[in-house]
Swiss-Prot record:
Its EC number is 5.6.1.7. CDD domains: GroEL (cd03344). The lineage of its organism: Bacteria, Bacillati, Actinomycetota, Actinomycetes, Micrococcales. It comes from the Bacteria. It catalyses: ATP + H2O + a folded polypeptide = ADP + phosphate + an unfolded polypeptide. This is Chaperonin GroEL 2. Together with its co-chaperonin GroES, plays an essential role in assisting protein folding. The GroEL-GroES system forms a nano-cage that allows encapsulation of the non-native substrate proteins and provides a physical environment optimized to promote and accelerate protein folding. The keyword Cell membrane does not apply. It comes from Arthrobacter sp. (strain FB24).
């Protein structure tokens, strides 16, 4: 396949144009007065959302060079979402501003490598200052963080209650309700950090996850590599017409191929994951899962083998959600007495062990067994509203978790403005010289942009607001919802510092790559290439 090439300034300008198109699409959603974006779907109703990463994932541009820029900006949003779960629009706006200001300097003759170094040093100084300015979350601030992310006080209160009940490390899942009410239900469940063995198991392509309702659960201590050994069990599961969830040390070779083929053909809705943990801890964790789901672990030690067992060794659960990294089991069929006995056994082990590492791992297992799962059932009048609400609640859960981890700073873009003081005080920044020193100004101008757009979307002059906030004390800032300048933390306008730092670092990373790019190579469109070599 022939390629198209772009060089030097033309290459960088194409990347900038692509980043601009994506950033201009998402930045209208920034802040409490941000607008929505409507996404067309090939089938079903359109999606209405103000979630940056959801919008970014839908953007594909005609121009292949510009599309590279859009994909880079998409990477900023996706990475920020992976690390912090929110802040995707802020990250995209920062990336756009850093690229724009940086390219201006490069076009004027500055050395891209020096500009890159200056941006990296400046951003690290600002990120460190953000952490210094952060404070731990207290009381009602949990509800405030969630309410700001979800743009709903009602959802904020619901999430504060959920985290209050399951703890900051507890699992919160989001399901669709059959009513119009949104409610919190506490249920027994568990999450562990193993995802599906193959993306072919995915049932929801948009969210890249596999969801099994009312599923049978097979827990096998060893590897499954031969189809013959578990074919009888597979046939029995097929006759039951229920989905099958398999946990094993590994599923490989023809066994995995058979499961994938059955899944693709729609013969059997099946998902396989590797067992969590290692060695003796893996055996213990499998027993925990078995207790929770009413299953028996298939193991030679217990005199059980796959080719000789029936449906009686399988457990069940109301709902199992599997992503590429995690598995969440909700409402397992294990009896309350069995779970209580297992919890008592773990507590007894905890009192007997002297090893800090063992204690930590036992406490993790105890939390998973005893802590339960908070299920938020999202209700809405229409399917379009339901999807949009689910996006907002997912962002809010991630934001709240991030706030509980690293603390909070003043929201509304003000924290970035206050952290700019680090550029005048940090010795690593003040020691920069030449083109690297000019990059400090690039970061200084870029960090104003999130606040500028929050104010602009609310109908105010962004630059005037930013100038006024720069003169105020730390934690003072502009409340776009009320239009007042006030103590934002006291007013409940707060952001998780983890989200702000992740947005800043990811934006700087992509901007540095764009500024040091010299050549772009893309596929030549098929219609242009069709008659290549046949011209007479």
């Amino acid at each position: 396949m022939a390629k198209q090439l772009a060089f030097n300034d033309a290459a960088r300008r194409s990347l900038e144009a692509g980043i601009d198109k994506l950033a201009n699409t998402v930045k209208v959603t920034l802040g409490p007065r941000g607008r929505n974006v409507v996404l067309d779907k090939k089938w079903g109703a359109p999606t209405i959302t103000n979630d940056g990463v959801t919008i970014a994932r839908e953007v594909e541009l005609d121009d292949p060079f510009e599309n590279l820029g859009a994909q880079l900006a998409k990477e900023v949003a996706t990475k920020t979402n992976d690390v912090a779960g929110d802040g995707t629009t802020t990250a995209t706006v920062l990336a756009q501003a850093l690229v724009k200001e940086g390219l201006r300097n490069v076009a004027a003759g500055a050395a891209p490598g020096q500009i890159k170094r200056g941006i990296e040093v400046s951003v690290e100084a600002v990120a460190a200052r953000l952490l210094e300015n952060a404070r731990p979350v207290e009381g009602s601030q949990v509800a405030n963080v969630a309410a700001i992310s979800a743009q709903s006080d009602e959802i904020g209160e619901l999430l504060a209650e959920a985290f209050g009940k399951v703890g900051k490390d507890g699992v919160i899942t989001i399901e669709e309700s059959s009513t119009t009410q949104t409610e919190l239900v506490l249920t027994e469940g568990m999450q562990f950090d193993k995802g599906y063995l193959s993306p072919y198991f995915v049932t929801d392509a948009e969210r890249q996850e596999a969801v099994l309702e009312d599923a049978l659960i097979l827990i096998n201590q060893g590897k499954i590599s031969s189809v013959q050994e578990f074919l009888p069990l597979l046939e029995k599961a097929l006759q039951s017409s229920k989905p099958l969830f398999i946990i094993a040390e590994d599923v490989e070779g023809e066994a995995l191929s058979t499961l994938i083929v059955n899944r693709i053909r729609g013969t059997l809705n099946v998902v396989a994951v590797k067992a969590p943990g290692f060695g003796d801890r893996r055996k213990a964790m499998l027993q925990d899962i078995a207790t929770l789901t009413g299953a028996q672990v298939v193991s030679p030690e217990l005199g059980l083998s796959l080719d000789s067992v029936g449906l009686e060794v399988l457990g069940t659960a109301r709902r199992i959600t599997v992503t590429k990294d995690n598995t969440t089991i909700v409402d397992g069929a294990g009896t309350a007495e069995d779970v209580a006995a297992r919890v008592a056994q773990l507590r007894a082990e905890l009192t007997r062990t002297d090893s800090d590492w063992d204690k930590e791992k036992l406490q993790e297992r105890l939390a998973k067994l005893a802590g339960g799962i908070g299920v938020i059932k999202v209700g809405a009048a229409t399917e379009v509203e339901l999807k949009e609400k689910k996006h907002r609640i997912e962002d809010a859960v991630s934001s709240t978790r991030a706030a509980l981890e690293e603390g909070i700073v003043a929201g509304g873009g003000s924290a970035l403005i206050h952290a700019l003081k680090a550029l005048d005080e940090d010795p690593a920044v003040t020691a920069l010289e030449g083109d690297a020193a000019s990059a400090v100004g690039i970061v200084r101008r870029a960090l104003v942009q999130p606040l500028r757009w929050i104010a602009q979307n609310a109908g105010f002059d962004g630059y005037v607001v930013a100038a006024k906030v720069a003169e105020s004390a730390v934690n003072q800032g502009f409340n776009a919802k009320s239009g007042d300048y006030e103590d934002l933390i006291a007013a409940g306008v707060i952001d998780p510092v983890k989200v702000t730092r992740a947005a800043l670092r990811n934006a700087a990373s992509i901007a540095a790559l764009v500024l040091t790019t010299e050549t772009l190579v893309v596929e030549k469109p098929a219609d242009e290439d069709e008659h290549a070599g046949h011209k007479h």
